[in-house]
Protein backbone atom coordinates (compact mmCIF):
# COMPACT_ATOMS: atom_id res chain seq x y z
CA UNK A 1 0.00 0.00 0.00
CA UNK A 2 2.82 2.41 0.76
CA UNK A 3 4.14 2.03 -2.80
CA UNK A 4 0.80 3.29 -4.13
CA UNK A 5 0.93 6.26 -1.78
CA UNK A 6 4.53 6.99 -2.78
CA UNK A 7 3.59 6.96 -6.46
CA UNK A 8 0.61 9.24 -5.80
CA UNK A 9 2.85 11.66 -3.89
CA UNK A 10 5.34 11.71 -6.77
CA UNK A 11 2.58 12.38 -9.33
CA UNK A 12 1.10 15.06 -7.07
CA UNK A 13 4.48 16.83 -6.74
CA UNK A 14 5.07 16.64 -10.50
CA UNK A 15 1.64 18.13 -11.25
CA UNK A 16 2.07 20.93 -8.69
CA UNK A 17 5.50 21.81 -10.12
CA UNK A 18 4.01 22.10 -13.62
CA UNK A 19 1.10 24.17 -12.29
CA UNK A 20 3.40 26.63 -10.53
CA UNK A 21 5.29 27.17 -13.78
CA UNK A 22 2.13 27.70 -15.86
CA UNK A 23 -0.11 29.58 -13.40
CA UNK A 24 0.78 33.21 -14.29
CA UNK A 25 -1.06 34.47 -11.22
CA UNK A 26 -4.25 32.49 -11.83
CA UNK A 27 -5.93 30.77 -8.87
CA UNK A 28 -5.68 26.99 -8.63
CA UNK A 29 -8.74 24.71 -8.82
CA UNK A 30 -7.59 21.91 -6.50
CA UNK A 31 -9.37 18.55 -6.36
CA UNK A 32 -9.30 15.98 -3.56
CA UNK A 33 -11.22 12.76 -3.84
CA UNK A 34 -11.72 10.11 -1.21
CA UNK A 35 -13.49 6.80 -1.56
CA UNK A 36 -16.76 8.33 -0.37
CA UNK A 37 -16.66 12.09 -1.16
CA UNK A 38 -15.13 14.68 -3.49
CA UNK A 39 -13.86 18.12 -2.49
CA UNK A 40 -12.69 21.09 -4.57
CA UNK A 41 -11.23 24.50 -3.71
CA UNK A 42 -10.24 27.59 -5.67
CA UNK A 43 -6.98 28.70 -4.03
CA UNK A 44 -5.06 31.94 -4.52
CA UNK A 45 -1.48 30.76 -3.94
CA UNK A 46 -0.05 34.29 -4.06
CA UNK A 47 -2.01 35.34 -0.97
CA UNK A 48 -2.53 31.89 0.55
CA UNK A 49 -6.33 32.20 0.62
CA UNK A 50 -9.19 29.96 -0.39
CA UNK A 51 -11.53 31.94 -2.64
CA UNK A 52 -14.27 29.33 -3.10
CA UNK A 53 -14.90 25.76 -2.03
CA UNK A 54 -17.46 23.02 -2.52
CA UNK A 55 -17.81 19.36 -1.66
CA UNK A 56 -20.28 16.54 -1.84
CA UNK A 57 -20.86 17.10 1.90
CA UNK A 58 -22.50 20.54 1.40
CA UNK A 59 -25.98 20.60 2.90
CA UNK A 60 -27.76 21.73 -0.27
CA UNK A 61 -26.12 18.93 -2.30
CA UNK A 62 -26.33 16.20 0.29
CA UNK A 63 -30.12 16.05 0.16
CA UNK A 64 -30.10 15.64 -3.65
CA UNK A 65 -27.24 13.15 -3.98
CA UNK A 66 -27.52 9.43 -3.46
CA UNK A 67 -23.79 9.18 -2.74
CA UNK A 68 -20.81 11.49 -2.87
CA UNK A 69 -18.64 8.97 -4.67
CA UNK A 70 -19.99 8.91 -8.22
CA UNK A 71 -19.69 10.98 -11.39
CA UNK A 72 -23.09 12.62 -10.88
CA UNK A 73 -21.98 13.94 -7.49
CA UNK A 74 -18.71 15.19 -8.97
CA UNK A 75 -20.61 17.04 -11.70
CA UNK A 76 -22.87 18.72 -9.13
CA UNK A 77 -19.83 19.77 -7.07
CA UNK A 78 -18.20 21.15 -10.23
CA UNK A 79 -21.26 23.28 -11.01
CA UNK A 80 -21.43 24.53 -7.43
CA UNK A 81 -17.76 25.53 -7.24
CA UNK A 82 -18.04 27.35 -10.59
CA UNK A 83 -21.03 29.28 -9.27
CA UNK A 84 -19.20 30.21 -6.05
CA UNK A 85 -15.99 31.15 -7.88
CA UNK A 86 -17.88 33.45 -10.25
CA UNK A 87 -19.55 35.07 -7.23
CA UNK A 88 -16.04 35.67 -5.82
CA UNK A 89 -14.97 37.28 -9.12
CA UNK A 90 -12.87 34.39 -10.46
CA UNK A 91 -13.33 33.03 -13.98
CA UNK A 92 -9.81 32.00 -15.07
CA UNK A 93 -8.19 29.20 -13.07
CA UNK A 94 -5.61 26.49 -13.55
CA UNK A 95 -6.73 22.91 -12.92
CA UNK A 96 -4.87 20.94 -10.23
CA UNK A 97 -5.91 17.30 -10.46
CA UNK A 98 -3.62 16.50 -7.49
CA UNK A 99 -2.00 13.51 -9.14
CA UNK A 100 -5.29 11.76 -9.89
CA UNK A 101 -5.86 10.50 -13.42
CA UNK A 102 -8.01 12.79 -15.57
CA UNK A 103 -10.77 10.21 -15.78
CA UNK A 104 -14.08 9.40 -14.11
CA UNK A 105 -14.98 11.66 -11.19
CA UNK A 106 -12.12 14.11 -11.80
CA UNK A 107 -13.08 14.54 -15.46
CA UNK A 108 -16.79 14.90 -14.61
CA UNK A 109 -15.98 17.64 -12.08
CA UNK A 110 -13.74 19.48 -14.57
CA UNK A 111 -16.34 19.33 -17.36
CA UNK A 112 -19.10 20.62 -15.07
CA UNK A 113 -16.88 23.46 -13.82
CA UNK A 114 -16.18 24.45 -17.43
CA UNK A 115 -19.89 24.39 -18.23
CA UNK A 116 -20.49 26.53 -15.14
CA UNK A 117 -18.26 29.27 -16.52
CA UNK A 118 -14.72 28.57 -15.29
CA UNK A 119 -12.02 28.89 -17.94
CA UNK A 120 -9.12 26.41 -17.88
Curated annotation (Swiss-Prot):
Entry protein name: Large ribosomal subunit protein uL18
HAMAP family (alphabetical): Ribosomal_uL18_B
Function in brief: This is one of the proteins that bind and probably mediate the attachment of the 5S RNA into the large ribosomal subunit, where it forms part of the central protuberance.
Annotated GO CC locations: cytosolic large ribosomal subunit
GO biological process: translation
Family: Belongs to the universal ribosomal protein uL18 family.
Pfam families for the chain: Ribosomal_L18p (PF00861)
Organism whose genome encodes this protein: Methylobacterium nodulans (strain LMG 21967 / CNCM I-2342 / ORS 2060)
PANTHER family cross-referenced by the UniProt entry: 39S RIBOSOMAL PROTEIN L18, MITOCHONDRIAL (PTHR12899), LARGE RIBOSOMAL SUBUNIT PROTEIN UL18M (PTHR12899:SF3)
Gene of this entry: rplR
Molecular function in Gene Ontology: 5S rRNA binding; structural constituent of ribosome
Keywords carried by this UniProt record: Ribonucleoprotein, Ribosomal protein, RNA-binding, rRNA-binding
Known partners and oligomeric status: Part of the 50S ribosomal subunit; part of the 5S rRNA/L5/L18/L25 subcomplex. Contacts the 5S and 23S rRNAs.
SUPFAM superfamilies the record matches: Translational machinery components (SSF53137)
Source taxon at top rank: Bacteria
